[in-house]
């Protein structure tokens, strides 16, 4: 089956939906959103924190937000990208409000602003402790009420279409690679359909699911990054994987693991070993209030030293009523698995949280492949550099969605559908009856990435990961050519590709910088 759209959006988080709304209102063509799960299951929904934007000019200004972002990124952020996001943020906040997103306000009607780690001022807009879910709700409502946007839920993009599919040899040095759309798996027919487009936008989110434990949903398998890499597009900064230091240790919930907010440490929570011994004094004078990456590395090291699968966060010394008031959701969540946080330690461990790198884009969100844009966590704008500043990701998504919408609307009339694109050919393949091969390989990828390419790295571990991933790659490609395309084998391919990219970029950075910490090159660039 062949479908034709002017704008094809792959992914339905804040980036994909805001882009779709922006192009649809201009009435310049048909818009389709491909969503691998339900519309409400995007990673955006899991964002607890908020949206960073300068809204109180009496106390804050753009220069402060820019400087905070550069410091957090270890001074390898692209300053032009930082300026673009910070200076355009207020206008995009206003547009989200117009779409129906509710941010908490004070009695005087002004935004109730929070302050998070790394920010010098109060500038975080939020909706209670579920900002991402509120943004997703507001945008979903706007999407469903827009007759000009078609949504294909539970459809899976398998590959983007380029000249390669027309029989042309395409390499990473090939000039003018063009994207003509995507091959998409229909879950009802179990067939791969051809979606031709004039403009394609990749908004597939992050890749936390390549690790054993992640705050991301199970669908965060790095699909967009892998597809663009296979199509010979440019990726960047893949070594910078942000780990949240404290998720609830619950072997039954790993994708996503339940976040234990950093506000709990700000409230007075103390990190301890299960025997009650404190350990943060060995790593930082700020103890449990040290920055996220330092705390994550400290916990990781203590777990490895003592052979533990978790450490503990202790708030039992705080007033029980106050704890329940400040953290009602965490209290109820822990209680549901038999832990009363007013009397018991909370078992916590680090988890993969955010990919700072991804598909390299310019200030318009344009990738190295013509007619293809990338937005949100799957993209690498240069904003985050070596480490993401808290709450900068959601605003990055909408600012770049706006830039990409404006740029693509100017160019869409120059393009046409390429009717020479062949339909997906799976002749000679068979239905895979050996699902155990896929599930076992997924477990192996998770183990490899967590043990060898995690928070603390070494060349020995990275080379071992490279070798193991290479073997899995060969096995999986042979299987992929033999069986009909399915979501599980496509996700496995993507996970292996992304795991390889993280490993390769980590091997190439011979220093400790941002989120990349290696025992073989302990000096920071500034210390050399």
Feature roles, as predicted:
Residues 227, 233-341, 346, 398, ...:
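An anion/pyrophosphate-binding glycine-rich loop and adjacent beta-alpha core
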Residues 12-14:
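Glycine-rich Rossmann-fold phosphate-binding loop(s) that bind the pyrophosphate
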Residues 1-6, 19-22, 29, 38-40, ...:
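Glycine- and aromatic-enriched mobile tails/lids
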Residues 8-10, 195-204:
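Short hydrophobic core segments
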């Amino acid at each position: 089956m062949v479908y034709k759209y002017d704008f094809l959006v792959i992914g339905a988080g804040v980036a994909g939906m805001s882009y779709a709304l922006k192009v649809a209102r201009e009435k310049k063509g048909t818009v389709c959103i491909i969503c691998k799960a339900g519309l409400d299951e995007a990673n955006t929904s899991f964002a607890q924190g908020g949206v960073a934007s300068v809204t109180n000019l009496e106390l804050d200004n753009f220069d402060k937000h820019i400087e905070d972002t550069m410091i957090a990124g270890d001074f390898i952020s692209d300053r032009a990208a930082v300026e673009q996001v910070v200076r355009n943020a207020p206008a995009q906040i206003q547009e989200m409000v117009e779409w129906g997103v509710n941010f908490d306000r004070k009695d005087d009607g002004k935004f109730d602003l929070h302050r998070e780690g790394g920010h010098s001022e109060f500038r975080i807009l939020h909706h209670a402790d579920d900002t991402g879910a509120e943004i997703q709700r507001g945008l979903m409502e706007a999407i469903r009420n827009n007759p000009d946007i078609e949504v294909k839920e539970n459809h899976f993009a398998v590959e983007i279409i380029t000249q390669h599919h027309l029989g042309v040899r395409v390499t990473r040095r090939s000039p003018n690679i063009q994207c003509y759309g995507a091959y998409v798996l229909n879950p009802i027919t179990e067939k791969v359909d051809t979606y031709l487009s004039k403009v394609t936008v990749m908004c597939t989110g992050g890749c936390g699911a390549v690790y054993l434990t992640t705050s991301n949903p199970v669908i965060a398998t790095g699909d967009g990054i892998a597809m663009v890499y296979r199509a010979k597009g440019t990726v960047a900064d893949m070594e910078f994987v942000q780990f949240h230091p404290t998720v609830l240790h619950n072997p039954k919930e790993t994708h996503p693991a339940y976040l234990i907010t950093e506000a709990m440490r700000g409230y007075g929570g103390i990190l301890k070993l299960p025997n009650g011994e404190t350990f943060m004094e060995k790593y930082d004078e700020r103890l449990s209030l040290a920055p996220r990456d330092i705390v994550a590395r400290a916990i990781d090291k203590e777990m490895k030293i003592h052979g533990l699968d978790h450490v503990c966060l202790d708030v039992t010394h705080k007033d029980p009523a106050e704890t329940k008031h400040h953290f009602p959701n965490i209290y109820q969540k822990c209680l549901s698995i038999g832990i009363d946080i007013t009397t018991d330690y909370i078992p916590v461990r680090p988890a993969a949280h955010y990919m700072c790198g991804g598909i390299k884009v310019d200030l318009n969100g344009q990738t190295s492949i013509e007619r293809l844009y990338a937005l949100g966590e799957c993209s690498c704008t240069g904003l985050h550099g070596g480490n993401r500043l808290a709450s900068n990701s959601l605003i990055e998504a909408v600012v770049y969605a706006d830039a990409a919408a404006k740029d693509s609307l100017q160019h869409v009339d120059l393009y046409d559908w390429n009717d020479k694109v062949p339909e997906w050919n799976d002749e000679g393949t068979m239905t895979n009856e050996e699902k155990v091969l896929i599930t076992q390989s997924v477990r192996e990828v998770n183990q490899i990435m967590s043990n060898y390419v995690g928070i603390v790295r070494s060349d020995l571990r990275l080379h071992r990961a490279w070798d193991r991933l290479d073997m899995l790659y060969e096995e999986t490609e042979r299987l992929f050519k033999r069986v009909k395309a399915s979501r599980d084998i496509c996700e496995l391919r993507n996970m292996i590709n992304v795991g390889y990219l993280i490993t390769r970029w980590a091997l190439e950075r011979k220093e400790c910088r941002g989120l990349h910490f290696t025992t073989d090159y302990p000096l920071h660039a500034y210390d050399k």
